Amino acid sequence: MEVLYSLSKTLKDARDKIIEGTLYSNVSDLIQQFNQMIVTMNGNDFQTGGIGNLPIRNWTFDFGLLGTTLLNLDANYVETARTTIEYFIDFIDNVCMDEMARESQRNGVAPQSEALRKLAGIKFKRINFNNSSEYIENWNLQNRRQRTGFVFHKPNIFPYSASFTLNRSQPMHDNLMGTMWLNAGSEIQVAGFDYSCALNAPANIQQFEHIVQLRRALTTATITLLPDAERFSFPRVINSADGATTWFFNPIILRPNNVEVEFLLNGQIINTYQARFGTIIARNFDTIRLSFQLMRPPNMTPAVNALFPQAQPFQYHATVGLTLRIESAVCESVLADANETLLANVTAVRQEYAIPVGPVFPPGMNWTELITNYSPSREDNLQRVFTVASIRSMLIK
């Protein structure tokens, strides 16, 4: 993997800097590195593809070295370099696609394609120029079963989940009380509602709670907490739990009371915030517990009083909600990130070349299913294919 990264970094620099008119002295070190790459690769043969519709391609390396010059690089010099660069980039692209198409239930973090396994040989260690990539560093740690640490912005840690629970239900669905939620990506939105606006509740207060267990622990998380759940702020028709009928939800938004968010790790409370909104920090957690209250307003103007009558029918439904959004966090496991294209790149390659479903990844790289059942085997394979995708992205946009 380190050799693949060094090849890609060298080729990227060469493509960007070996241009007509450049002083040789400005790129002499790069050209020496480029020549070392050629010397090491010459005389070797590789094969890529042969899985799904990814065609088999054979690669032979027999290139001349780039010479020295006292002056600027001329058109002939650059053209010679370009021919070599383009062949190497095509090779790297195919090695990466071949690797992203493969998976293994055992030691999935190790190279799976024939070409990348060959590049891992001792003879290619002379190409190992640069390992500054965060993904390479973490791949090395994961490969040695040591602690990794990825910094994510908007990590896709929550499997998609959208549902409701009813704490009070009537056959006609005309006087309901409960919670509804939408968890997805890096965001939780949860709403508590009571058609009667806590009319007969103790002290006219309804208590709501929403607990979310993460598939992997996060640390050093920057989080935004808001006293609103905008996705549940408009009318909708909702299918009943048994699918036999539908019920109408027509929310009137109130501000939640006594809001508390707890971050737990292995059942122990690590951080607690009460009635604090905006930016909050969570040190280390694998579970989030949100609790909040709906309080019937003790004093109401006639207009508000008309919204919340003392008896049925209840045309409008009192609703309070919260939004919790993880803006950035550190995780010991590789995850999809809303700010990165790695999952999209891997999925696109596997779809384009009709890669058959293997023993590890779900069909279509379905992220909700993948993260819901995030096994060590999936973690290892994701670590590898995301590392390869990050390398490929240096050369192929």
UniProtKB/Swiss-Prot annotation:
One of its GO terms (cellular component) is viral envelope. The N-terminus is blocked. Sumoylated with SUMO1 and SUMO2. Sumoylation of viral proteins seems to have a positive role on viral replication. Keywords: Calcium, Capsid protein, Intermediate capsid protein, Metal-binding, Ubl conjugation, Virion, Zinc. Residues 62-73 are annotated as: Interaction with the inner capsid protein VP2. Zn(2+) binds at H153. Pfam families: Rota_Capsid_VP6 (PF00980). Intermediate capsid protein that self assembles to form an icosahedral capsid with a T=13 symmetry, which consists of 230 trimers of VP6, with channels at each of its five-fold vertices. This capsid constitutes the middle concentric layer of the viral mature particle. The innermost VP2 capsid and the intermediate VP6 capsid remain intact following cell entry to protect the dsRNA from degradation and to prevent unfavorable antiviral responses in the host cell during all the replication cycle of the virus. Belongs to the rotavirus VP6 family. Homotrimer. Interacts with the inner capsid protein VP2. Interacts with the outer capsid glycoprotein VP7. Interacts with the outer capsid protein VP5*. This is Intermediate capsid protein VP6. It comes from Rotavirus A (isolate RVA/Human/United States/WI61/1983/G9P1A[8]) (RV-A). The lineage of its organism: Viruses, Riboviria, Orthornavirae, Duplornaviricota, Resentoviricetes.
